[in-house]
């Protein structure tokens, strides 16, 4: 059975509400259809998303379709381009991520997901 991956967040208020209601770990990948680096890591990220624990909720957000959250986070220097993945532990009342990844380095991508799997295995 494949893991549900959510592809939309309407606005920053919805994003902040998700963080407040988080019961485990939330991952938000920001991408764009025109972004070549995003395409370079796409398959790897999908594979890692599938391998995350049940208490990890994954979002795969196209910044051209759902730009409000991306612009909000960029204005606060939480992301500075795509591809970027932000990880949040429960509960989080701010927009500051607990973990982040940016770029195309596949070794660092694996390290990022290893950390996510490690913390999601603990009693959050």
Question: Model-predicted segments: where are they?
Answer:
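Eukaryotic short linear interaction motifs
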Residues: 36-37, 66-69, 94, 107-110
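N-terminal leader/targeting and pre-domain segments
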Residues: 1-26, 107-124
């Amino acid at each position: 059975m494949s893991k549900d991956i959510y592809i939309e967040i309407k606005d920053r208020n919805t994003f902040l509400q998700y963080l407040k209601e988080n019961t485990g770990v939330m991952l938000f990948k920001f991408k764009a259809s025109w972004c070549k680096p995003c395409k370079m890591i796409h398959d790897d990220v999908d594979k890692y998303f599938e391998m995350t624990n049940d208490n990890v909720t994954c979002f795969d957000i196209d910044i051209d379709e759902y730009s409000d959250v991306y612009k909000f986070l960029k204005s606060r220097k939480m992301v500075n381009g795509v591809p970027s993945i932000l990880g949040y532990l429960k509960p989080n009342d701010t927009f500051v991520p607990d973990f982040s990844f940016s770029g195309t380095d596949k070794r660092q991508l694996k390290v990022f997901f290893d950390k996510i799997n490690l913390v999601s295995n603990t009693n959050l």
